[in-house]
């Protein structure tokens, strides 16, 4: 129940903070390649979402070798509300709502004070928390099986 409330709270906060509307992006999202403001017409599919770019050139660079930009792309998926956090990005354990750090406008929650301290000490929080390793185990589409499976695995592991 607490996990569902955290997910609902995160979704509500994301919607309010970023002013997302269906089919529109009003967030000041930056291009994952150049860091410039995006053109909402320039995007490509990535994982189960869309990554936005400032121009067709950056889009082509990403499509040619996305591996160089996965951390920034993962961050953008969360910043635009296409993905939500389901567990602690460092341990994949259940989050606690009061263990939170803001990463460039995105709230990331943790399971304990140790993980929170590690994140706060990091000089590159985006790389630490949105790399493919941490992203794949801790983030998923809202109401997705990935989020539900992650919760189920932890519960069954305790038995």
Task: Tell where the protein language model's regions lie, with residue ranges.
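Intrinsically disordered, low-complexity terminal tails/loops enriched in metal-binding residues
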Residues: 18-159
């Amino acid at each position: 129940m607490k996990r569902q409330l955290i997910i609902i709270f995160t979704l509500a906060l994301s919607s309010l903070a970023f002013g997302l509307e269906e089919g529109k992006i009003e967030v000041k999202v930056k291009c994952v390649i150049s860091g410039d403001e995006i053109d909402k017409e320039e995007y490509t599919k990535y994982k189960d979402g869309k990554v936005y770019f400032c121009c067709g050139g950056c889009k082509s660079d990403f499509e040619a070798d996305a591996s160089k930009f996965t951390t920034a792309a993962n961050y953008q998926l969360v910043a635009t509300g296409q993905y939500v956090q389901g567990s602690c990005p460092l341990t994949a354990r259940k989050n606690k709502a009061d263990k939170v750090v803001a990463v460039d406008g995105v709230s990331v929650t943790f399971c304990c004070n140790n993980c929170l301290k590690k994140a706060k000490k990091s000089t590159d929080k985006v790389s630490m928390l949105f790399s493919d390793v941490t992203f794949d185990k801790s983030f998923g589409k809202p109401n997705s099986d990935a989020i539900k499976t992650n919760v189920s695995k932890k519960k069954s592991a305790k038995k």
